[in-house]
């Protein structure tokens, strides 16, 4: 298993790096050049920089990921593609994407886009909380322990 992180706006990178390096599982952070950093990463953690295009990180992750790899993303489109490839996919708020829930998530995203296109406003996501982070940590540790 390898871990790929859609890292541009991922609030749990620290959890992923800490838990994965302790378990000696390689991590690849995929992020745009606009988030460039000179920060030294622990052994086993690689950062790949991509152009700032809308889906550049998603495309790169899909090029790299193989069946049974673990992907962390908040992007439903990437999650859908990764599930079809046989990957395990987690959201940073601590839930697992599945073939059973991805259709509803994509449909909700589509309907919200149509509402916004018509000029109306939609509610954004709830703020990320410490409880969300702990929920993610518990789920992540259970997945990498398998």
UniProtKB/Swiss-Prot annotation:
Species name? Bacillus mycoides (strain KBAB4) (Bacillus weihenstephanensis)
What Pfam families is this protein classified in?
DUF188
Source taxonomy = Bacteria, Bacillati, Bacillota, Bacilli, Bacillales
Family classification: Belongs to the UPF0178 family.
Highest rank taxon of the organism? Bacteria
UniProt protein name: UPF0178 protein BcerKBAB4_2842
Residue ranges spanning the membrane: these are none
Could you tell me which PANTHER family the record lists for this protein?
A: UPF0178 PROTEIN YAII
What InterPro entries does UniProt report for this protein, alphabetically? UPF0178
Which HAMAP family does the annotation name? UPF0178
